[in-house]
Regions:
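A conserved structural motif in NAD(P)-dependent oxidoreductases
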Residues: 257-268, 279
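Amphipathic alpha-helical dimer-interface segment in Rossmann-like NAD(P)H-dependent oxidoreductases
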Residues: 123, 127, 162-182, 191-192, ...
Length: 297
């Protein structure tokens, strides 16, 4: 879908379920998804709203992070992306799309569950770009478990370290380097407000992200830095078929939304662009829901 400007019925703008079953091991690869998600590869057109800014985005090889990386580059920002080494194939595509915009790109393969790696990401971004103006903490782990007894300590630890500990470690490393006017954006979820029974550990972390974001916003506004969260609803990303949902739910993913379909990553990036830009100069400590009509409390 390349036309995002012409007025049209949003219910029919992108594919609707049923979708084919498409199991793949976590963390998954975009190329194996059917239908292919729209990250804005052709659809997103920038307007220099972030010209000269320097951004670090975690989990940017696929899904929402990939769409944000593409959009930021097309808005004029230099972009560093982090991802797991197993996601290199997807990451190479994102790096090529960033570089095609004539801005700097930086690859940061590693595991955010490693505390030291979070500091290293910040250091390498500062070295490559000479500073950091936008931090998007987006990397996430989602693996469904149908019973609390199936959520092992290993599961719980991996999800909390990926989704919540890494947020803290990365903010600790980055905030001393953020100038006045900088922005921190976290990815929360509708799961913070309407938790699914099969996503117990994931939903727990998303609730934590909301409260952490609001608390950090109160600290960092004293430096002139804004901090906000985005809470997505059902979005068609590789997180879902690679263990984030049972395959029977993948088949009808997004059907329960007011639109009768899941959102595409390109549909949420305008919020990330706004929150990173000076146009959101009076916005901090907020959670922006993009939930397909479900709303957030």
């Amino acid at each position: 879908m390349s036309d995002r400007l012409t007025m049209q019925d949003p219910r029919d703008q992108y594919p609707r379920p049923p979708f084919p079953r498409q199991p793949q091991p976590a963390p998954g690869l975009v190329a194996r998804m059917e239908p292919q998600p729209d990250h804005g590869e052709e659809a997103y057109h920038g307007h220099a709203r972030l010209k000269g800014r320097r951004a670090l985005i975690t989990g940017a090889d696929s899904g929402i992070g990939r769409a944000v990386a593409i959009a930021y580059a097309r808005e004029g920002a230099d972009v560093a992306i982090s991802y797991l080494p197993s996601e290199e194939a997807d990451a190479r595509e994102v790096i090529a799309l960033i570089e095609a915009e004539g801005v700097k790109a930086l690859s940061l393969p590693g595991d955010v569950r490693d505390e030291a790696w979070n500091a290293t990401m910040v250091e390498r971004t500062l070295e490559a770009f000479g500073g950091l103006d936008i931090l998007v903490v987006n990397a996430g782990r989602q693996q469904f478990r149908e019973d609390v007894g199936q959520v092992s300590t290993e599961d719980f630890d991996a999800t909390l370290k990926t989704n919540l500990y890494a947020l803290h470690w990365l903010c600790q490393a980055a905030t001393p380097h953020l100038p006045p006017g900088a922005a921190v954006i976290t990815t929360a979820s509708i799961q913070a407000y309407e938790p699914s029974d099969i996503l117990l550990d994931y939903a727990t972390t998303k609730g934590g992200i909301v409260t952490y974001t609001k608390a950090l916003a109160k600290q960092l506004i004293e430096k002139g830095v804004r901090v906000n969260a985005v809470a997505p609803g059902p979005f068609w990303t590789v997180l879902q078929p690679s263990g984030g949902q049972p395959q029977e739910k993948v088949e009808k993913f997004g059907a329960h939304s007011a639109f009768g379909r899941p959102g595409q990553p390109v549909e949420i990036v305008p919020v990330y662009v706004l929150l990173a830009s000076q146009e959101a100069s009076f916005v901090t400590g907020e959670v922006w829901g993009v939930t397909g009509g479900a709303g957030i409390a």
